[in-house]
Structure formats: structure tokens, C-alpha cells
Amino acid sequence: MENSNPLAKIEDVSFRYPKSDADALSGVSLEIPRGSFFALLGPNGAGKTTLLRLLCGRFAKFSGTIELADDVRGANAFLDPIACGILLENPGIYPKLSINEYVDYFVGFYAARIPEWNDAEARERIASLAKSLELPSLDTRMGKLSLGNRQKVQLLRAMAPAPRLLILDEPVANLDPMSRETVWKLIADWRRQEGGTAIVCSHILAEMEEEATDFAIIDRGHVLKSGRVADIASETATFRVEVRGNLAAGKTPESLTPEKIRDILAAAGIEAEVAPAQSSLSRLYRETV
């Protein structure tokens, strides 16, 4: 996958957790296009979260290289926490803090490090995000929130500084279908309005693929496939044959083209339509993993 101005370029990255006898990641090479919705796919334990943690600078020792664009790179050569909204699995909460107090903690962190920070604009943005996410009163204590609302608060916190990049690990975990739809729309609107880039892991592929522009399928630490979602149809072209009448069972050689199939059936007096079958990220995932 090539991009003239990628936001991140990962080359031959391998990583092994201490005391483990197997690599969590092995020879991973990817490019994250700027402005993309990058879907990181794979079964549990595939290495998706490990890769996100590496991008976030959680592990300093690994082999290979990770190159980041200047506008998202921090002083330590890893992602700048100011330019990036990060939501990893199982974030800690402070049960005695209200939503407002919890978010205020991070607002203070951002305000101290972003020279152009405008507190009034930030407050307006946070209020708008809270409304879009249908959160309860911001005076509600974190410990009294449902798991779904805690997840929404974490997304609010990640989006509070108007980041250029979102890294989201299972952003719709513990959410009901309507809330999941709200979250996907919020991320899509942010991308369109801000030109941001999102790197997202989610097990609910059928929902995520509606917004995904690029993808990588990882299993057992290896990248099995990656590319642009728009290219899937041309790379995995198959055809559906709709037969009107009875067709005797038999083997169909792979070399048969749609035209040949249509001609053979027509010669046998069978009317049929041969049309491209709809290819999708979900289908490619099922065929790959």
C-alpha cells in the first residue's frame, strides 16, 4: 500500500512481550494514509492492540521502524498525545470524579501544552460532543455510569483537543446498536469536517466497513492482507449466476468467464443472468482469516 504522504509508515516491525516465547508482531509493514479511516482487523490475540500500543509509545523496545508525520510526532519520536486522541481497551476511571471533573483534568493537560488553546472553544466543543453522545448530566460521577456511558466519556476525552489523529481500540464496546450508530457517525463527521485520520479496531466489522477507506487484516502477528477498501471488488472479483430453471449438478472450471457461462447455459436453453457478486471487507475478512 503506497501513499505519497502517509501519516505513519511501519516497516518490518516485530515485537515480543517479556517472558513470551512467541512474537506478538512479526515483520509488520503498513502505511496509514493521511485522512483515512484505517480499519485494523483480526481475531482476538492477533496483535492489533499491540500494534496500537507501539504507535502510542507504550513499548520502547522493538525491531523495525515506525515513521510518523511531523504534525503527529512527539519529542520522543512516538505519537504526540496532544495531536492524537487515544482510546485503548480498559482505560482506568476515577469513580468519585464527575464527568466534568474527569474531562477537566485532561483539558488542563491540553491547555498547558497547546499554545493556541482557546478554553471557550474547547468548552463549546466538549458540550457539543457530550450532547451528540447523549451523555447524562456532566455532574454525574464516573462510578455511577453504565459501562456504555463510561465508554462514551472516554471517546469524549479522546476527541476533546480536536486531534488530527484518532486511535480507537473497540470504541463501541458495551454500546447498544443506536449508540454505536451515533459513535460511528460522530467519527465520520469529524473526519469529513477536520480532515482527520482514524485508526480503528472493532469486532463489529459490518458497521465499521461502511466508513473504512483502508484496511489491514492481522493474524498471529502477521499482516495477511492490506490495501484500500475501494480496491477489494477488483481484486476479489467473483460472479453470481442466477438460473431460471433446473441446472444439473456439476463442476465449473475456474477458467470459465461470465460470458462463457452465459453462452453454455444459453446453448442448453437455460436463461441466466451473470452479474458481479458484491465484494465487501467483511467477505474478504472471512475468506482470509
Question: Which residues make up each language-model segment?
Answer:
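Catalytic Walker B motif of ABC-type/P-loop ATPase nucleotide-binding domains
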Residues: 166-170
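Helix-to-loop junction immediately C-terminal to a conserved catalytic motif
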Residues: 56
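The feature captures the beta-strand-to-loop junction immediately N-terminal to the Walker
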Residues: 41-43
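Conserved ABC ATPase "signature" region
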Residues: 104, 108, 119-137
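A short, flexible loop at the N-terminus of ABC-type nucleotide-binding domains that lies
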Residues: 1-10, 14-27, 76
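Conserved ABC transporter NBD signature motif
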Residues: 64-80
